[in-house]
Amino acid sequence: VGSEMCIRDRTYGLSELYEKQNGNPERSGYGFELTLKLKKEGLENPALEVRHICSLLQMIAGITVNNGHQFTPGQFLAMGQQRGLDAASKSAITGFITKEDDIGTVESPFGKVQLVQLIGVKAEEIEQMKNKTMTPAQLAEILKDGLTDYKR
């Protein structure tokens, strides 16, 4: 996706950058990094939204750090709220699905790192996935541009 359409990828690292710390030689850190591409068209304050996205990524990464949950493609994440995930809480986006980022898995000096992309989804889409009438993979196909769009 070109930079004219989205704010460049935001990435939250859960890998090892400077030295090997975990005992698994095949995996760098937790073995994945979270990415998110935010559609910039229609954003009132893009800089504020970028800071807010970084806070959301940090909160989501905390699930891994605190509970050991591994985010992989094909999952959904209900954020437990009915208000939007944008900075003003006005968006219909209340959760995320995961898919493999276009970059995929990379080899680092400290092991493999899979880039897992988060795509913002609406409450009704989360409900469809909870009720198993739609899968995250099916929704990712519908949202094939991979952008989190607060205006959809």
Regions flagged by a language model, labelled:
Residues 8-31:
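Long, contiguous, structured domain-core segments that constitute the functional module of a protein
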Residues 45-48, 72-73, 128-131:
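A short secondary-structure junction signal
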Residues 80-152:
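Polybasic, proline/glycine-rich intrinsically disordered low-complexity segments
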Residues 39, 65-66, 123:
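Residue-level marker of positions within ordered structural domains that often coincide
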Residues 12, 20, 49-84:
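Acidic, metal/cofactor-coordinating or nucleic-acid-engaging core segments within structured domains
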Residues 25-45, 113-116:
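Glycine-rich, often proline-containing surface loops adjacent to acidic residues and nearby aromatics
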Residues 2-7:
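Short, small-residue-biased leader/transition segments that mark boundaries at the very start
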